[in-house]
Amino acid sequence: MKKLISVLMTVLMLVALAVPGMSVLAADKQVTVYIEGYGHGIYSDTKNPSAENQIFPTESILEPLMGIFNDLTKDLVNGLVTGDYTEYCDRIYNAIAPAYADLKLDKNGEATDGSGCGKDMLTDSYYMENYVNSNNIKILFEYDWRLSVEHNAEILEKFIDRVCREQNVSKVNLLGRCLGGNVVSAYLQNGKNLHRINDVVMLIASTEGVDFIGALFSGKIKLDAEAVDNWANYFLSQEGIITDPAMNDFVTSLVSFINQIKVLGFGLDFVQMVLDEVKENVLARTVRDTYGSFPSYWAMVPDEYYDNAIDFIFNTDELKAEYEGLIEKADSYHDNIQITARDRMAELKAQGKDFLVISKYNYPNFPLSKDADAQSDGTALTSATSFGAVCAPYEKVLSGKYINLLTENEKKYLSPDNMIDASKCLFPDTTWFIKNCYHNNFPHSMDKLIVRFFATENMTVFTDTVTYPQFVDYSKETGEITPVEGPDDLPTETEKTLVVFIRFFTNFINFIKKLLNGELGSLFG
């Protein structure tokens, strides 16, 4: 008996000694739950998420339109002559809407047809990987990005409990990217287990909306020649849309050339005129039967557009009644989360939660709205993803008058290139800006900043101004980030005009030479 007691005592002592060791391990182990933006695969049958049943991603909506281009041209001419654009609108709608027939939700904004992301985050296995180093683990939260973000936030709450239990940790970090930031915001507003959250990262979060989505959903589309020029030059040349270099150079320089001689503006005036004639017919119903059926996309309509968007898409009392369930979900996010998000984050910050905000800049905005010249990451406005930064327009700097009015303390948050004033951000001390890093680009160097934030108590933009100052510049060539340097040498209007003319004629001559020699490749890859 004594021997048995002695063995039991030894076991108990070993267990007692092991408990503190387990606590230390759990404390050192950083687990991050990563909520991506839209884009997870959607399947027609969630019980059989196979390639044959995948309904998202779908083909580009431009592809059906290209097949009816000739007929569209005839319908447009007929509309211009008669003033009746019905056939033109019907042809566009009938080309686009069928592509989303399987993907769209019902009139309550719900998936009642058995479609979904094909993953139950409360029971199925989840994807996890080391995050920068072996002390950090990143776990992916997969969800049906079409649904209400509040619905997905409820699932996230339960998933966090599951992760803590299975990973043997008491807390996790949250990382919300783009639409994932909306889900995080909904969770922070309504979650019952916020004691399980350590740090929160809002990575180019669309919590407060995306400008071009607001313009499309509200019908308040405004075309501007300078914005089209900026957008075409960046996206055609930098994103490799046109694969033949000579063709690409010619097209981009042609856009700039016709803008400089004021012809582009006249052309856009015509497009704007047609758009104003047809938008209530074709745009409203096309949006309603595609992305407008997703409560999640309504969560990305900025507050300034929201009321107009509801009235534009559901433009009769009958439609409002018919889509009452969807509108209720949209209203709930707008009224209870979007317009209170900053106050809620500030409240949680005061309670001890740490927030890291990462925004990006130096890209043209989509040329569709009154803010087409605003600073952006190519998708979302920098002022929105930073929760309040004051930004110079694209390819411009803040005025000397504005800078002179800043206090000495506020000037600490001024970007070296004079494009961003971060002093007006919700969290100016923990908001970083990455220059020249496109919205959909998430380099390893950025991940290292995030992990450094997790590991450093009370880290701010002033903690390490050599490696991680508030404003960093991303290099496509090296994949690294370095401190942003002084003001860019931006050309004057006279210099820009001269450069545009020289560039156009040089590329035009090169284009003609290659055309005559049969050296041009295909237009698109």
Which role does the model predict for each range below?
Residues 8, 167, 195, 350-351:
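A structural signal for short coil/turn segments at secondary-structure junctions
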Residues 9, 13-17:
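Hydrophobic core
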Residues 17-28, 525:
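Sec-dependent signal peptide cleavage junction
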Residues 139, 143, 147, 277-372:
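Alpha/beta-hydrolase fold catalytic core
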Residues 225-317, 321:
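Alpha/beta-hydrolase-fold enzymes
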Residues 498, 502-509, 513-520:
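Membrane-interacting alpha-helical segments
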